[in-house]
Design a protein with these regions (language model features):
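A glycine-rich beta-to-alpha transition motif near the start of alpha/beta enzyme domains, typified by
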Residues: 10-47
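Alpha-helix C-terminal capping segments
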Residues: 1-9, 54, 225-229
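Conserved phosphate-binding/catalytic region of the ribokinase-like
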Residues: 158, 162-267
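Hydrophobic residues at beta-strand termini and immediately following loops
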Residues: 13, 64, 201-202
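Catalytic-core segment of enzymes that process non-peptidic bonds
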Residues: 48-53, 201
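Ribokinase/PfkB-type carbohydrate-kinase core domain
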Residues: 6, 28-41, 56-198, 230, ...
Length: 267
């Protein structure tokens, strides 16, 4: 949704149930311009539900319903066509918790055409992933976005030997042939490592209301910024600006202000 709000021709690959929640989800997606032709309607599985609770420090935890429609995303001609036309595709671990959706996602990512960006947004949620999914996803990707906890987990999994965060991201990129590694650090801003160099950006001063959705907003702005030709510094600044704005608003997908949208368009 954030990518569409930032002016991209955005599409979603997923599945919802033949239920009121599915109707509402599709209506909301289409209202902001997201193409939903690859979102399946499944009569035998309910639309996914996530219950979010926030602790005293403002950190969210998630109760993610099992057996949801998005655990059964079918591989269709619409998915294949969308992947072949994409300039960028974003995927994570959570939607790969079931074998059916995992196979569909892997096929879609593998079906993109060069020089499409294949960004692995790590999103390690509770016990909804295993080591094989993480490694397979890194091998499919040509870019990765992760937070500090996720980098620590991947450093252990991949036995990264580097001592510093920058060197860990470089080592990870070299091992898996990644063009870009993006590390988000909450109030500490973000760090981008690519063959263009290393770029750090601070997070703008923000009164935090709700951090849910900030990571997805960062990812959307990152990819849109790259696709419109921003420099690494511009991409980093604008992605931080979008994420900070989302943190200042209630809800995971608040309408973006015109100034925030302009920051991605101009860098």
């Amino acid at each position: 949704m954030h990518a569409a709000a930032l002016g991209a021709d955005a599409a979603m690959v997923s599945a919802v149930g033949q239920d009121a929640r599915g109707d509402a989800a599709l209506k909301q997606l289409r209202a902001v311009g997201v193409v939903c032709s690859a979102v399946a309607r499944l009569p035998d599985h309910p639309t996914g539900v996530v219950r979010v609770s926030v602790d005293a420090k403002g950190l969210p935890s998630y109760d993610i319903a099992a057996g949801s429609a998005w655990d059964f995303i079918p591989s269709t001609s619409a998915v294949e066509h969308m992947a072949q036309r994409a300039d960028a595709i974003c995927f994570g671990t959570l939607a790969q918790r079931s074998p059916i959706s995992r196979a569909t996602i892997r096929r879609a990512v593998a079906g993109t055409r060069e020089p499409a960006w294949r960004l692995f947004d790590v999103n390690l949620r509770q016990n909804y992933y295993d080591d094989a999914v993480v490694i397979d996803s890194l091998e499919l990707a040509n870019a990765v976005k992760l937070n500090e906890e996720e980098l620590a987990a991947i450093a252990r999994l991949c036995r990264l030997e580097s001592a510093t965060v920058v060197e860990q991201l470089r080592e990870l990129s070299q091992r898996f042939g990644l063009k870009l590694a993006a590390l988000t650090r909450g109030a500490g801003g973000s760090l981008l490592v690519s063959n263009q160099g290393v770029c750090e950006a601070p997070a703008p001063p923000t009164k935090i209301v709700d951090t849910v959705g900030a990571g997805d907003a960062f990812t959307a702005a990152l990819l849109v910024g790259i696709l419109v030709g921003q420099s690494l510094d511009e991409v980093n600044r604008s992605a931080n600006a979008v994420a900070a704005y989302v943190c200042s608003q209630p809800g995971a997908t608040p309408p973006l202000s015109s100034s925030v949208r302009l920051s991605v368009a101009k860098g």
